[in-house]
């Protein structure tokens, strides 16, 4: 039997190959990171190169789900758009039903359920997209979650998806600190993302989410942070070379 074609059939060694293929599509997608700070959440994504006459605003990988919740994706853009539409509709349904904003963890469970259903439904295929979802609940505490094509969801302090995500996560694990300020989170997110993407602010898109407001960082401010990070990386590289020469 061709187990790699059947969506709802396990292989003898316990694999769902279509789900694994969806995960591979994510690993080939543009890198995205999310960082949770003391009172802010930072989304930073690798920018897709666009044609000269193309409007770059139509290729964004960071989406608004509700006033207090945003999502960054890696993988197939068309699949991400479908998942985002499901999430936005759920936010609207919740407001209409309860006259209140949906909690972040409740929305994450819904998104994960949408992704999981596609792994066991005939006539469809798993969504080739992973998401980083961040927002603020009523108590004002920031939350950061990650969902995967299999339908699993998990809470994170800092997360990475897309190509070279393991390299980025390794950097984050070594350098993350609890309770970082807004600017420190931005610096950390950019430095982590530059582990996976080419240097330069032109290749990065960044959104700062704080309680009650969200804004894309301007090119000027983003460039300033990138220059600081690149200078810091050069100093660290020079220090390592000196230590190697002394040894």
Swiss-Prot record:
GO terms for biological process: ubiquitin-dependent protein catabolic process. Gene3D superfamilies: Glutamine Phosphoribosylpyrophosphate, subunit 1, domain 1. It holds the Pfam family Proteasome. Signal peptide: none annotated. The proteasome is a multicatalytic proteinase complex which is characterized by its ability to cleave peptides with Arg, Phe, Tyr, Leu, and Glu adjacent to the leaving group at neutral or slightly basic pH. The proteasome has an ATP-dependent proteolytic activity. The 26S proteasome consists of a 20S proteasome core and two 19S regulatory subunits. The 20S proteasome core is composed of 28 subunits that are arranged in four stacked rings, resulting in a barrel-shaped structure. The two end rings are each formed by seven alpha subunits, and the two central rings are each formed by seven beta subunits. The catalytic chamber with the active sites is on the inside of the barrel. This is Proteasome subunit alpha type-7. Belongs to the peptidase T1A family. SMART domains: Proteasome_A_N. It comes from Trypanosoma brucei brucei.
């Amino acid at each position: 039997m061709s187990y790699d074609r059947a969506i709802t059939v396990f292989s003898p060694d316990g694999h769902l190959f279509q789900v694994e293929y969806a995960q591979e599509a994510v690993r080939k997608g543009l890198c995205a990171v999310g960082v949770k700070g003391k009172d802010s959440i930072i989304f930073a994504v690798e920018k897709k190169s666009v044609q000269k006459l193309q409007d770059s605003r139509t290729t964004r990988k960071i989406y608004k789900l509700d006033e207090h919740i945003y999502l960054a994706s890696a993988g197939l853009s068309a699949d991400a758009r479908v998942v985002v539409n499901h999430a936005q509709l759920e936010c609207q349904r919740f407001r209409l039903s309860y006259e209140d904003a949906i909690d972040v963890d409740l929305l994450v469970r819904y998104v994960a359920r949408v992704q999981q259903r596609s792994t066991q439904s005939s006539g469809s295929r798993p969504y080739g997209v992973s998401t980083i979802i961040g927002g603020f609940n009523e108590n004002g505490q920031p939350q950061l979650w990650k969902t995967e094509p299999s339908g699993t969801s998990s809470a994170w302090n800092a997360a990475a998806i897309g190509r070279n995500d393991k390299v980025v996560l390794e950097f984050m694990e070594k350098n993350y600190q609890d309770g970082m300020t807004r600017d420190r989170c931005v610096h950390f997110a950019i430095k982590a993302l530059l582990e996976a993407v080419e240097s330069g602010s032109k290749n990065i898109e960044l959104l700062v989410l704080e309680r009650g407001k969200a804004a894309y960082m301007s090119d000027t401010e983003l460039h300033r942070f990138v220059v600081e990070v690149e200078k810091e990386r050069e100093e660290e590289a020079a220090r390592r070379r000196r230590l190697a020469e002394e040894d």
